[in-house]
């Protein structure tokens, strides 16, 4: 086919800067939302609208560090024109508060009753996916190892091939333009135009099978009478994010839910997050149930095992020595054992007093005293560590 009969593709020369103004403003707003999410993440992860959302796609959450757009009054009243010297950047504050440089207390702060209006906050619609991306970026299962008899494989799609035909949505613009430039240069005219059919390059994908180790997480929660509404909410908030993290980041992680008071039993996920119980507390019962599950269902030769237990620490004193013995037995079969204690008022904890004597490096604990500690507990239990790569 002669060059005159070749179908030509052109590169648009139109100045699209004006068309992008709305898009640029939207991107700037999204950047501010993402920055606000990152700065407020410890408080956001325990927002009731999120924890009680059952994983819905979009939730409304208050972000107090994000102001709505407004015009501010110029207190200085200086004569000026609207042209700057070019040193300002996007996001710079150009208004002043008229306080003469003195730091003022915000509304609703300080001693005595005031007459100032309250501080408004911005209620943003944020997808669970956005929060997960910000939250889970630095988390991973610790000490994950390749196990024997590992036949498990996951399918992974990678854009790792370039072809001359494909979907228009997958066209590789850079490679297409380079191909056209080379062809035109060989003809004596180094230019990106015209682009012919033979210059087109499309990205395409291949399905890659990767070996993957199996893992099981044992979620154990104290549901006794001493665990009040706040304590159970904190424990369930942690396990809510833990299950989201595991299912988002790992293809093959089983989760077993175990609730206990004086007795322990395996429950469904729905019962674990909604059912309330009462009674006394014997924590050794849940460790026995965990060992029973491991012996019957999850061999340490085939599974990476991670037990996590949340309680208020108010255990039967005579049961503490038994708990320590069972935890040490669990750690011989597990990659890591995590204990979270919800202790808002820093009271004496019989269980933590016993656990502080455990010196094993695979035993991790965290005391939660406020809502933001759910975030910090997740970071502590699932922290990334160099050298903890799957062997």
Swiss-Prot record:
Q: Which domain of life is it from?
A: Bacteria
Compositionally biased spans, kind Gly residues: 98-115
Report biased composition (Basic and acidic residues) as residue ranges.
21-31
Residue ranges annotated as compositionally biased, kind Polar residues, are: 1-16
Q: Where is region (Disordered) located? A: 1-31, 80-117
Pfam family, any one? DUF444
Name the family the entry cites.
Belongs to the UPF0229 family.
List the PANTHER family. UPF0229 PROTEIN YEAH (PTHR30510:SF2)
Q: What's the protein here called?
A: UPF0229 protein BC_0551
* Species this protein is from: Bacillus cereus (strain ATCC 14579 / DSM 31 / CCUG 7414 / JCM 2152 / NBRC 15305 / NCIMB 9373 / NCTC 2599 / NRRL B-3711)
């Amino acid at each position: 086919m002669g060059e005159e009969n070749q179908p030509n593709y052109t590169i648009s020369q139109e100045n699209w800067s004006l068309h992008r103004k709305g898009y640029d403003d939207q991107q700037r707003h999204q950047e501010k939302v993402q920055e606000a999410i990152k700065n407020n993440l410890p408080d956001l992860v325990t927002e009731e609208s999120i924890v009680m959302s059952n994983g819905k796609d979009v939730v409304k959450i208050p972000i107090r560090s994000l102001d709505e757009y407004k015009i501010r009054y110029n207190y200085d009243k200086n004569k000026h024109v609207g042209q700057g010297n070019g040193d300002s950047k996007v996001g710079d504050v150009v208004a002043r508060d008229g306080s003469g440089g003195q730091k003022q207390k915000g509304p609703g702060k300080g001693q005595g009753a005031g007459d100032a209006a309250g501080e408004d906050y911005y209620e943003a619609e944020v997808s669970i996916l956005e929060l997960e991306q910000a939250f889970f970026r630095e988390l991973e299962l610790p000490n994950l190892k390749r196990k024997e008899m590992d036949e498990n494989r996951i399918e992974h799609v990678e854009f790792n091939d370039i072809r001359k035909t494909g979907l228009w949505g997958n066209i590789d613009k850079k490679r297409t333009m380079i191909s056209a430039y080379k062809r035109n240069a060989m003809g004596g005219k180094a230019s990106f135009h015209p682009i012919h059919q033979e210059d087109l390059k499309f990205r395409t994908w291949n399905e890659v099978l990767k070996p993957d180790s199996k893992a099981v997480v044992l979620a154990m929660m104290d549901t006794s009478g001493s665990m009040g509404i706040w304590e159970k909410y904190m424990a369930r908030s942690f396990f809510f994010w833990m299950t989201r993290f595991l299912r988002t980041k790992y293809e093959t992680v089983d989760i077993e839910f175990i609730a206990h008071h004086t007795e322990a039993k395996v429950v469904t996920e729905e019962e674990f997050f909604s059912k309330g119980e009462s009674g006394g507390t014997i924590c050794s019962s849940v460790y026995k149930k965990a060992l029973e599950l491991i012996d019957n269902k999850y061999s340490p030769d085939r599974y990476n095992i991670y037990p996590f237990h949340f309680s208020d620490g108010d255990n039967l004193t005579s049961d503490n020595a038994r708990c320590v013995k069972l935890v040490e037995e669990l750690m011989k079969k597990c990659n890591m054992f995590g204990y979270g204690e919800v202790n808002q008022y820093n009271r004496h904890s019989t269980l933590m007093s016993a656990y502080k004597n455990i010196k094993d490096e695979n035993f991790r604990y965290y005391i939660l005293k406020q809502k933001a500690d759910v975030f910090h507990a997740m970071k502590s239990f699932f922290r990334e560590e160099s050298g903890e790569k799957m062997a």
